[in-house]
A protein has these predicted regions:
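The conserved cystathionine-beta-synthase
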Residues: 383-401, 408-409, 427, 447-466, ...
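Short glycine/proline-centered loop/turn elements that form peptide/ligand docking sites
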Residues: 134-137, 380-381, 390, 414
Length: 493
């Protein structure tokens, strides 16, 4: 198979030490002793959108197939949404819907918002992004760092509810005469971006040899634009939908029936309605993928192939792997690395988050030690010694986002607890106490419960506004707080 190579258009002269040979894009040193393909130099970050490389995944079981991924995470905004954002804004400018200094408003799971923030920053627009509250903290912080106004709304309501994120964005734009509501779910430029850029790139990179394309539906632009392009050139190319369990789309494709929407944690794909730009007739089959499988496959992708990708990529890859393993003849299968996984480090790449949400099973004891979020014997918790300065203790509590820490002596026995109220009292009493040791401010009265205690034994501890120290004569096992008990009871529902 021919693999396309070459420099992007607009590359600048890199100096006299190298020269470009013919039009191959390969640069040679003057003495011809070494070769290198150099990336071009751009004058604006928006010029870097598109023309992303492809990678063949070699370490997964793909049956008789070959599986390629388009590395859309390498766009400057770290996602495939850069493509649609620049196309939709260009179209709005040309039509006069967006004027200089205007306001861009969009409902997004985050990546479209980040792409729009990139463009707004370069072109001088204001940006308001409305997001469901299940999205990662990294996305929210990233958007705000780029100057966007972020409005969080409920993720547990469907279209038509006054707090549904798309309806809120539309209302905000309607009330501001200078605002342009992007509305990626109904914007034809969304489809155009993939039909004119993403799909042709893949077609050229794989020399037109594509038997199946696997994608998810967030707004519908990817499936509609790329699916149409591939079907026009190869009617036998199968368009495969990767859909989270809880979305209404997979049942609609496979069973031709409409189901009530559920909930899912994967971000960016799956829907509780059919976006108007989505051409369902292009989809040949669908796979419904659980959150657990999506997260597991995304984590495997990092371990096996070194690709740090987002949660929706786990869904796409899980579906692609199922498709590949079902085949009896060799096929070329393509899917997407939609975004970079750095935005999910606090979620699916965080073992504690995975445990809290039931996606990783820890060894169990069958007693209240199973309620401990961070186990001391496994070095998961954060502790202090009595001599640590109070300023250092405050720094650690902030760094680790904890409200209390156990204070241990040299024998690993709990001699006290330092919590937020202790710190507050210390600062109120003496503003110059930063160098004073923790022992001067910690609570020496600790509520110790044995591992054999019952859940009911924890209630008096919490009523006394204390934290439970789980320990016996041999070991300190960890702390149990109110939220730990709440999480435990939540999992029993």
């Amino acid at each position: 198979m021919k693999i396309a190579r070459g420099m992007r258009s607009g590359a600048r002269d890199v100096g006299q030490d190298v020269e470009k040979v013919a039009d191959t894009g390969v640069l040679y040193t003057r003495d011809m002793t070494a070769t290198a393909t150099l990336a071009p130099v751009f004058s604006n970050i928006l010029e870097m959108i598109g023309n992303t490389p492809m990678l063949e995944l070699k370490r997964f079981n793909v049956g008789p197939c070959r599986l390629f991924v388009k590395m859309e995470c390498l766009n400057p905004g770290n996602s495939i949404k850069d493509r649609i954002a620049v196309t939709m804004i260009d179209a709005a400018e040309k039509s006069g819907k967006l004027r200089a200094g205007g306001r861009i408003v969009e409902a997004t799971a985050g990546n479209t918002g980040l792409a729009l923030a990139l463009i707004a920053g370069q072109k001088g627009y204001r940006l308001t992004v409305v997001m469901p509250d299940k999205m990662s903290d990294e996305k929210i912080s990233h958007l705000r760092a780029m100057g966007a106004e972020v409005i969080l709304t409920r993720s547990d309501v469907a279209k038509g509810h006054p707090e549904y994120y798309q309806d809120i964005a539309e209302r905000i734009a309607r009330e501001d005469p200078d605002a342009f509501f992007v509305n990626q779910f109904a914007n034809p430029a969304n489809v155009q971006a993939h039909y004119e850029t993403t799909a042709p790139e893949i077609w050229a990179q794989l020399d037109g040899k594509i038997d199946a394309f696997v994608a998810g539906v967030g707004s519908g632009g990817t499936v509609s634009g790329m699916g149409r392009y591939f079907k026009e050139r190869n009617p036998a190319c199968e368009i495969v939908l990767a859909d989270p369990v809880g979305s209404i789309l997979a049942p609609l494709v496979n069973e031709k029936k409409t189901v009530a929407p559920g909930s899912w944690l994967v971000e960016g794909i799956g829907e509780d309605f059919i976006p108007s730009i989505l051409d369902m007739t292009l989809i040949d089959k669908a796979y419904a993928i659980t959150d657990a499988e999506s997260f597991e496959v995304a984590r495997e992708l990092l371990k096996l192939e070194g690709v740090l990708a987002g949660s929706s990529v786990g869904t796409l890859l899980a579906a692609a792997l199922k498709y590949c393993r079902e085949q009896t003849t060799p096929k070329i299968v393509v899917t997407l690395i939609c975004d970079n996984g750095a935005k999910y480090l606090s979620k699916m790449f965080n073992d504690f988050w995975m445990v809290d949400n039931g996606f990783i099973a820890r060894p169990t004891y069958g007693d209240i030690r199973d309620l401990i979020a961070r186990r001391h014997l496994e070095r998961e918790d954060f502790c202090l010694t009595p001599s640590v300065p109070i300023a250092q203790a405050i720094k650690r509590m902030r760094m680790y986002s904890v409200s209390q820490m156990a204070v241990l002596d040299e024998h690993d026995h709990v001699v006290g607890i330092l919590d937020e109220s202790d710190v507050l009292l210390a600062l109120v009493r003496d503003r110059d106490c930063s160098r004073s040791p923790v022992r001067d401010f910690m609570s020496s009265r600790v509520e110790t419960v044995k591992p054999t205690a019952s859940v009911q034994d924890l209630i008096p501890v919490f009523r006394a506004d204390r934290v439970a120290v789980v320990a016996d004569a041999k070991h300190f096992y960890g702390l149990i707080t109110r939220i730990d008990l709440i999480n435990y009871l939540r999992k029993q529902l």
